[in-house]
A protein has these predicted regions:
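Nucleotide-activated sugar donor-binding and catalytic core shared by glycosyltransferases
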Residues: 1-145
């Protein structure tokens, strides 16, 4: 089971992680909350400051980062983003996303970004940029419809 394997790997590198489907009460020392159900992720973007889009770990095209960006989340992603290369390129220009190359470098990146995001002004800036980016993309899409 891949989700339990990921959970074990994160716990092994010192990141206290929890699966959404475990239905356990979330504790303050949880570093990573894994939403492992289809269609529920969007319900959590407004509650978080940092999102890792796990669909980018497998070669199926990636996940759209715009919903997460619009809620002011800093976005971490894996190597497989073929369907959203241009979107990620744009987000990288705004410095609101980081590529995770391996599970081993995830711990340091997550800790670094959590410390960075403790500052409330950063989250407000990310939310503002996310709104701008999403609105710009919606405008571009409407031109073709």
């Amino acid at each position: 089971n891949r989700k339990n394997e990921i959970l074990d790997e994160l716990n092994n590198i010192g990141l206290n992680s929890q699966l959404h489907t475990s239905r356990k009460k979330l504790s303050k020392d949880t570093d990573i909350y894994i939403v492992d159900t289809y269609g529920d992720t969007k319900n959590f973007y407004s509650l978080s400051k940092l999102t890792f889009l796990g669909g980018s770990l497998i070669p199926h095209g990636g996940q759209n980062p715009l919903e997460s960006a619009r809620e002011g989340n800093y976005i971490l992603y894996g190597p497989h983003i073929d369907n959203f290369k241009e979107v990620y390129k744009m987000l990288e220009k705004f410095k609101i996303t980081t590529k995770i190359n391996s599970i081993k470098n995830m711990k340091s990146v997550v800790r670094q970004k959590i410390n960075f995001l403790q500052r409330n002004t950063v989250n407000k800036k990310l939310k503002y940029l996310g709104d701008k980016i999403l609105n710009k993309n919606l405008y571009e899409i409407k031109k073709f419809i």
